[in-house]
């Protein structure tokens, strides 16, 4: 008899993997997870256990007979008792009259109560409360407001406990959107899956392969519609896939406080191995704290080497189960559709172990996946219902917009009336276009939804005018003192891998007042927009060593208010972070980049050196500014301008979209395509 895995045995005997693992523990048999192999001896023991628990045929027959008899008896009782119905009603009415209202053990209130309201809560007559107040020297009428102290005084006289409720503003519904429901109200929901990985490793092909094999097969006449998410059905269970750019599912949405994804599928090409974006995807998934399933794609290629992929991923703490780890690896060929069913089975297995649940019997809450403005339909938004049930006609607040759900369309283009947890739907009826990652909540009353939506829009406008509270080195010490910061997230970029490792190792050793440094991402090369988005989502500081941010990264950093620190000496980085944590950071000057020029042509002139014919692409270049030469995103020289000319004339500055001639002091190795970045040092007002 061949060996069998835990999840395979569970499936064979129609039980959950979790229940089987519990059973094995009761039998003192150690299993690490659902992929553990069971030998023949253990399988025999389990067979005997489950055989013993099954009732015999005779027992089942006896139970069935009792049920049939009880049904017959109940029918007789029904006939017999029909004539006594009036008497029972009379007795019930009589008992109801003699019942006395019990005094409660505890009452709750918020703000204040009138005498009448307090009497109602205490189950007393208002005249009795007025009399008690009179005895305390307080002249009150039935509609008079009572303060907290008076309410407590009266309630204590009756021996009743008082609790004041703190009302959370409904405009900030994000604070109670994620409140835990009672366990008995929770029901199983489909897992929400995002596919991530390096460019050209087969993410889109895998999504298409899953969609074509599972979605269209079960939907006769259904039109697959791109709404940013879709559902597939496997073994009578559903899985929701987010069809968005991989990183957007984590960064943009997490930056707005939305946790959408339950499971990440990391696609790695078997012939290519781990690439820079693969590492980036791993760091995004780890920062979001979600399980990772590795799909080793392109197994049909002659150069496929899955062992190499496994080996490389162990460096990032993704150890295969076959090697004693807990990461699931699934070999697939997305283009040929091989291994897809196995991958979907593994997703269901992780869902079963993680136990994803939600309460369908409440007003819907969730997150915006995509949104756009359509000429014919107006505002269209794809929503992922994460809790509750959304219905057509529900008043809804989405981010700072509001409206009523006029129509709902499923991922296969069909109109639906209800959408439960983990279901993606496209809705119309909002007054303006929300942003991806905005939270939404349905309400009972349209007037209330409008009021909350308008209040949120006003609050957002006021908040936009104020400063964003992102982490920066300047206010780091103050935040540590106030207890707001327990861990500092850093993103480290450098010109070479050796510098990255040295800097990361040095930074990890810093520990001031129990506040530790956590490096969430490292990389080689220029600081990119993706780094800034991750920093914004994780409230991190970006540190660049011998590298610069590109134009898009700078623009995004200003927009998201992300702190970027650039250095050329490692110990200066360490000193600056330590000084900031100890509250001794006192920068007198701050570097301000004023412009960039691209070298279009070079001329070598005797006794002068290399003259660079440049085109100013951004800002301006001034005669007295410091400059640095950037080649392929890496700083190769830093110094001063020697000459700055327009045609044959010396000039003080050259503005954007103009050409100029530049020479650099003590540097002649200028090449076409180099970027000359000009900067000045400005005094910082403290």
Swiss-Prot record:
It comes from the Bacteria. CDD domains: IF2_eIF5B (cd01887), IF2_mtIF2_II (cd03702), mtIF2_IVc (cd03692). GTP binds at residues 197-204, 243-247, 297-300. Residues 243-246 are annotated as: G3. Residues 54-105 are annotated as: Disordered. Pfam families: EF-G_D2, GTP_EFTU, IF-2, IF2_N. Residues 197-204 are annotated as: G1. Residues 69-81 have a biased composition (Basic residues). Residues 297-300 are annotated as: G4. InterPro entries: EF-G-like_DII, IF2_II, IF2_N, P-loop_NTPase, Small_GTP-bd, T_Tr_GTP-bd_dom, TF_IF2_bacterial-like, TIF_IF2. GO terms for molecular function: GTP binding; GTPase activity; translation initiation factor activity. It is found in: Cytoplasm. Residues 222-226 are annotated as: G2. Residues 188-357 form the tr-type G domain. The keyword GTP-binding applies. GO terms for cellular component: cytosol. Coiled coil: none annotated. Residues 333-335 are annotated as: G5. One of the essential components for the initiation of protein synthesis. Protects formylmethionyl-tRNA from spontaneous hydrolysis and promotes its binding to the 30S ribosomal subunits. Also involved in the hydrolysis of GTP during the formation of the 70S ribosomal complex. NCBIfam families: IF-2, small_GTP. Belongs to the TRAFAC class translation factor GTPase superfamily. Classic translation factor GTPase family. IF-2 subfamily. This is Translation initiation factor IF-2. It comes from Bacillus thuringiensis (strain Al Hakam).
């Amino acid at each position: 008899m061949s060996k069998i895995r835990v999840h395979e045995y569970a499936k064979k005997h129609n039980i959950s993997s979790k229940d089987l693992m519990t059973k094995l523990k009761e039998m003192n048999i150690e299993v690490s997870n659902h992929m553990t192999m069971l030998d023949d001896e253990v399988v025999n023991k389990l067979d005997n256990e489950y055989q013993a628990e099954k009732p015999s045929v005779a027992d089942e027959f006896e139970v069935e007979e009792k049920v049939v008899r009880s049904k017959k008896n109940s029918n007789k009782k029904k006939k017999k008792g029909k004539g006594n119905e009036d008497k029972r009603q009379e007795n019930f009415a009589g008992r109801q009259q003699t019942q006395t209202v019990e005094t409660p053990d505890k009452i709750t209130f918020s703000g204040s109560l009138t005498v009448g309201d307090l009497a109602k809560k205490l189950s007393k007559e208002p005249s009795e409360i007025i009399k008690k107040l009179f005895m305390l020297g307080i002249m009150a009428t039935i509609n008079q407001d009572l303060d907290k102290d008076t309410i407590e005084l009266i309630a204590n006289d009756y021996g009743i406990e008082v609790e004041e409720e703190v009302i959370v503003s409904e405009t900030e519904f994000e604070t109670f959107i994620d409140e835990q429901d009672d366990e008995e109200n929770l029901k199983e929901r489909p897992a929400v899956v995002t596919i991530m990985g390096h460019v050209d490793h087969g993410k889109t092909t895998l999504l298409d392969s899953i969609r074509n094999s599972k979605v269209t097969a079960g939907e006769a006449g259904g039109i697959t519609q791109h709404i940013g998410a879709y559902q597939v059905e496997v073994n009578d269970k559903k899985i929701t896939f987010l069809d968005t750019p991989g990183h957007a599912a984590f960064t943009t949405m997490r930056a707005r406080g939305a946790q959408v994804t339950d499971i990440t599928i990391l696609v790695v090409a078997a012939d290519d191995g781990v690439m820079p974006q693969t590492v980036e995807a791993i760091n995004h998934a780890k920062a979001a704290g979600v399980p990772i399933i590795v799909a080793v794609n392109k197994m049909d290629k002659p150069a496929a080497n899955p062992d190499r992929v496994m080996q490389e991923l162990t460096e990032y703490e993704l150890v295969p189960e076959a090697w004693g780890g807990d990461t699931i690896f699934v070999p697939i060929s997305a283009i040929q559709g091989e291994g897809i069913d196995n991958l979907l089975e593994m997703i269901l297995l992780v869902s079963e172990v993680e136990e994803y649940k939600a309460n369908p019997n409440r007003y819907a809450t969730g997150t915006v996946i995509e949104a756009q403005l359509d000429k014919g339909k107006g505002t269209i938004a794809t929503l992922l219902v994460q809790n509750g049930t959304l219905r057509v006609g529900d008043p809804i607040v989405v981010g700072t917009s509001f409206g009523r759900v006029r129509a709902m369309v499923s991922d296969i283009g069909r109109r639906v009336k209800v959408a439960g947890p983990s279901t993606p739907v496209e809705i119309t009826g909002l007054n303006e276009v929300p942003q991806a990652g905005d939270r939404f909540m349905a309400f009972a009353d349209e007037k209330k939804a409008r009021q909350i939506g308008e209040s949120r829009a006003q609050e957002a406008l006021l908040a936009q005018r104020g400063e964003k509270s992102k982490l920066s080195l300047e206010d780091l010490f103050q935040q540590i003192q106030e207890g707001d910061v327990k861990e500092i997230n850093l993103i480290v970029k450098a010109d070479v891998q050796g510098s990255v490792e040295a800097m990361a190792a040095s930074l990890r050793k810093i520990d001031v007042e129990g506040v530790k440094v956590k490096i969430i991402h490292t990389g080689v090369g220029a600081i990119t927009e993706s780094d800034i988005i991750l920093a914004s989502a994780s409230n991190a500081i970006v540190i660049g060593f011998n590298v610069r941010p590109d134009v898009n990264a700078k623009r995004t950093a200003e927009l998201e208010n992300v702190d970027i620190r650039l250095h050329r000496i490692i110990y200066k980085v360490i000193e600056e972070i330590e000084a900031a944590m100890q509250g001794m950071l006192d920068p007198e000057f701050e570097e301000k980049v004023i412009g960039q020029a691209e070298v279009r042509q070079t001329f070598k002139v005797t006794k002068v050196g290399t003259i660079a014919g440049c085109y100013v692409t951004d800002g301006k270049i001034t005669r007295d500014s410091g400059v640095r030469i950037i080649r392929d995103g890496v700083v190769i020289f830093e110094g001063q301008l020697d000459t700055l000319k327009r045609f044959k004339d010396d000039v003080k500055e050259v503005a954007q979209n103009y050409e100029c001639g530049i020479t650099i002091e003590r540097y002649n190795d200028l090449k076409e395509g180099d970027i000359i970045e000009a900067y000045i040092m400005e005094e910082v007002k403290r």
